[in-house]
Amino acid sequence: MSEKPQQEEQEKPQSRRNSFAVIEFTPEVLDRCLKQVEFYFSEFNFPYDRFLRTTAEKNDGWVPISTIATFNRMKKYRPVDKVIEALRSSEILEVSADGENVKRRVPLDLTAARNARIEQNQRTLAVMNFPHEDVEASQIPELQENLEAFFKKLGEINQVRLRRDHRNKKFNGTVLVEFKTIPECEAFLKSYSNDDESNEILSYEGKKLSVLTKKQFDLQREASKSKNFSGRSRSFNGHKKKNLPKFPKNKKKNGKEESKEDSSAIADDDEEHKE
């Protein structure tokens, strides 16, 4: 009787937490690896990447390479020693003497970078309604590459950012596409905007897509938040009943108790859902 549990324990598969598939680091692969990390530290990403920026600020600009290696798009580059080898060839980045950390050779002017955000938004479109219901977290890196290839056929772009649901962190079917120039962005919008029925239909895997400016997307998102969390509608979508704010009761009037909304509870709840 005592042998069976022991046998089952021996047959239990080993953890794959630290396992990886070794890839051949050809010159092309080394170059892609380097460009990916340089992008993380670029003016297009670093000022807006809170995690990366705060990590660097705490360490005089340095970020552990082991941390960067955990990013989804970097997990395929193993062993990490090859990543370090690629980074040592960078003209933008500097690797520490012990090979443990990396930082920009010339720090970014974050104030100027933040001021450039307005211009960046003018070059950015939101493309919505991508198939996403069956997309697992493990499929995100491959999907990212596929969507980048999809948009590169349609215009000159800097980056494609997949939006995620703040509750489950899964891809929500919307991507933000940043074009290299405002004219490129405007040309794409003119060709595929849903405002003009004569425009060409933009689709992906047979599904019609919707195209909005970044400003339209932000306004739509704020309107959705207001609808879901305003005191007037009190819908609180996605919340269990036990998590709803409790409103203090007023004195009885005409034999009935009236409730008064606690606006601070609603504001706190809305703040919790900011991305």
Swiss-Prot record:
Residue list for modification Phosphoserine: 15, 19, 230, 233, 235
Domain HTH La-type RNA-binding: from-to ranges: 23-112
CDD domains named among the record's database cross-references: LA_like_fungal, RRM1_La
Disulfide bonds: none
Keywords assigned: Acetylation, Methylation, Nucleus, Phosphoprotein, RNA-binding
Region described as Disordered: spans on this chain: 222-275
Modified residues (N-acetylserine): 2
Omega-N-methylarginine, modified sites: 104
Subcellular location: Nucleus
A single GO molecular function term of this UniProt record: mRNA binding
Post-translational modification: Phosphorylation is not required for the roles tRNA and snRNP biogenesis.
Role according to the record: Molecular chaperone that binds nascent RNA polymerase III transcripts, stabilizing these RNAs against exonucleases. Required for the 3' endonucleolytic cleavage that matures tRNA precursors and for efficient folding of certain pre-tRNAs. Cooperates with GCD14 in the maturation of a subset of RNA polymerase III transcripts. Functions also in the assembly of certain RNA polymerase II-transcribed RNAs into RNPs. Binds and stabilizes newly synthesized U6 snRNA as well as precursors of U3 snRNA from degradation. Facilitates efficient Sm protein binding, thus assisting formation of the U4/U6 snRNP.
Quaternary structure note: Interacts with SXM1.
The protein's name in its UniProt record: La protein homolog
Primary gene name: LHP1
